Regions:
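Short, functionally important structural connectors and interaction interfaces within domains
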Residues: 8, 35-36, 41, 110, ...
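Bacterial N-terminal signal peptides
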Residues: 7-15
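Positively charged n-region of N-terminal signal peptides that target proteins for export
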Residues: 1-4
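Helix-rich interaction surfaces within compact, conserved domain-sized segments
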Residues: 76-140
Length: 140
């Protein structure tokens, strides 16, 4: 009986901890709407990506040319289990290597020696104020 009470108490505490983590707001705020792309002056070439960080299971932050930071939102939990040191894999779609819309970005992440392909839902250029507000560990 005593073991059952201890097990129930531990399970309750664990579920409260999970709920607290799930309720924690992202420092990024809500993601851009699905299908959101970039205005023509903010497009970039895939070979200009210099660094990245994985903000959460659906958000990748990329440094482009050492000047700009872009927020890429992916479908599902494509980035779950990935860490910042896991390489991202981009392929140029046929016709152009310029990324302006989600469909322009063919993205994957190499986790534990296996590639996971991601469906890009939105791309947004972050403002200097948004980048400055990021915690240090999230800055690409």
């Amino acid at each position: 009986m005593r073991l059952a009470i201890i097990a129930l108490a531990a399970a309750g505490a664990a579920s409260l901890g999970v709920a607290a983590v799930a309720a924690k707001e992202s420092p990024l705020g809500p993601p851009p709407p699905k299908g959101a792309g970039l205005p023509s002056g903010h497009c970039f070439r895939s070979h200009d990506i210099r660094n990245h960080t994985i903000a959460d299971k659906q958000t990748l932050l990329m440094n482009v040319n050492g000047r700009d930071t872009y927020r890429v939102t992916v479908a599902g939990a494509c980035l779950a289990g990935a860490i910042d040191s896991d390489p991202i894999i981009t392929r140029n779609p046929p016709g152009s290597d310029i990324i302006c819309r989600p469909i322009d970005m063919d993205l994957g992440v190499a986790k534990s020696g296996f590639e996971t392909r991601c469906i890009v839902q939105s791309i947004a250029k972050m403002s200097p104020a948004e980048v400055a507000a990021l915690p240090k560990k999230l800055k690409p």
